[in-house]
């Protein structure tokens, strides 16, 4: 049975950047949040090149900290551009599996992402589909972006062991985004890395 979760306690600093009170850490840089995400997660996983060479119909990204959803939004946007440029490509859909223990209230999420006009369409779509703070899996379909997001709300250490993994693996790429290890060491443990290894395609 689903249970109601504690929402994230956040404040916005003098620069308008969202800060997680529980971890005393920012969600992203206001000046370069989108560029940071593209550099660390999109380019860091070489996603555009991998998509071009992908022969399956779907690609699966798993993320260990949904936060404001910015990483998912940027990935959606990039995948939409990929599909528009390559309409006949065999890769048709992006699936993102993301976890979050302390979900933001939708108003805080919208406030946080309002500084990035380049993703305003994606933010609006996410806000329309954003689930209540109840434990479990919440699927959000974004058909215009050829993307589905399964947002798993709860403790990542309890959630990942629940994920069924085919013999050849489940996850094609990982977004590790759980605040700095010094601020949130629970998101950077050996047990978590063991689960990631279990779920990853080889």
Positions of PLM-derived features:
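A short SAM/SAH-binding and catalytic strip from SAM-dependent methyltransferases
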Residues: 156-157, 171-187
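Glycine-rich phosphate-binding loop signature in dinucleotide/nucleotide-binding domains
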Residues: 55, 165-169
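Glycine-rich SAM-binding Motif I of class I
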Residues: 68-73
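S-adenosyl-L-methionine
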Residues: 108-166
């Amino acid at each position: 049975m689903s249970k109601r979760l504690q929402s994230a306690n956040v404040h916005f600093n003098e620069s308008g950047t969202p800060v997680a009170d529980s971890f005393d850490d920012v969600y992203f840089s206001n000046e370069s949040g989108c560029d940071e995400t593209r550099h660390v997660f999109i380019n860091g996983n070489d996603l555009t090149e991998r998509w071009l060479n992908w022969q399956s119909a779907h690609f699966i990204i798993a993320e260990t900290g949904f936060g404001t959803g910015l990483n998912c939004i940027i990935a959606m946007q990039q995948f939409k551009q990929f599909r528009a440029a390559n309409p006949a490509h065999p890769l048709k859909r992006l699936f993102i599996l993301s976890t979050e223990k302390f979900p933001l209230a939708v108003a805080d999420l919208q406030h946080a992402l309002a500084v990035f006009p380049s993703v305003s369409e994606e933010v609006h779509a996410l806000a329309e589909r954003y689930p209540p703070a109840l434990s479990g899996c919440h699927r959000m379909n974004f058909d215009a972006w050829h993307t589905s997001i399964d947002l798993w709300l709860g403790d990542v250490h309890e959630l990942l062991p629940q994920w069924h993994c085919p013999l050849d693996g489940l996850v094609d790429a990982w977004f590790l985004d759980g605040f700095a290890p010094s601020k949130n060491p629970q998101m950077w443990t050996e047990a978590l890395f063991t689960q990631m290894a279990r779920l990853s395609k080889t």
